[in-house]
Amino acid sequence: MAKLEITLKRSVIGRPEDQRITVRTLGLKKTNQTVVHEDNAAIRGMINKVSHLVSVKEL
């Protein structure tokens, strides 16, 4: 399977709690932090929910 490189580009300050939880579940804590996840439906759903806060690159 492909891997996705997910980077938190915008802060979660002032964002709804569900978006904060989604960002934390992806493993992101700080702005400009990058994590790598397998490309699957669950991860894609989380990315879609916070797409305005993160950038995604396929590896």
UniProtKB/Swiss-Prot annotation:
Question: What SUPFAM superfamilies has UniProt attached to this entry?
Answer: Ribosomal protein L30p/L7e (SSF55129)
Instruction: Report the record's disulfide bonds.
Output: none
Gene Ontology annotations for the cellular component aspect, listed alphabetically: cytosolic large ribosomal subunit
* Name of a matching Pfam family: Ribosomal_L30
Q: Please indicate if the UniProt record lists Nucleus as a keyword.
A: no
Arranged from A to Z, the UniProt key words for this protein are: Ribonucleoprotein, Ribosomal protein
For this UniProt entry, the molecular function terms from Gene Ontology, in alphabetical order, are:
structural constituent of ribosome
Please indicate which superkingdom the organism of origin belongs to.
Bacteria
Q: Does the keyword Mitochondrion apply?
A: no
Q: Name one GO biological process term.
A: translation
Q: Which family does it belong to?
A: Belongs to the universal ribosomal protein uL30 family.
Assembly and binders: Part of the 50S ribosomal subunit.
Q: Record's PANTHER family?
A: LARGE RIBOSOMAL SUBUNIT PROTEIN UL30M, MITOCHONDRIAL RIBOSOMAL PROTEIN L30
Q: What is this protein called?
A: Large ribosomal subunit protein uL30
What organism is recorded for this protein? Bacillus licheniformis (strain ATCC 14580 / DSM 13 / JCM 2505 / CCUG 7422 / NBRC 12200 / NCIMB 9375 / NCTC 10341 / NRRL NRS-1264 / Gibson 46)
What gene is this protein translated from?
A: rpmD
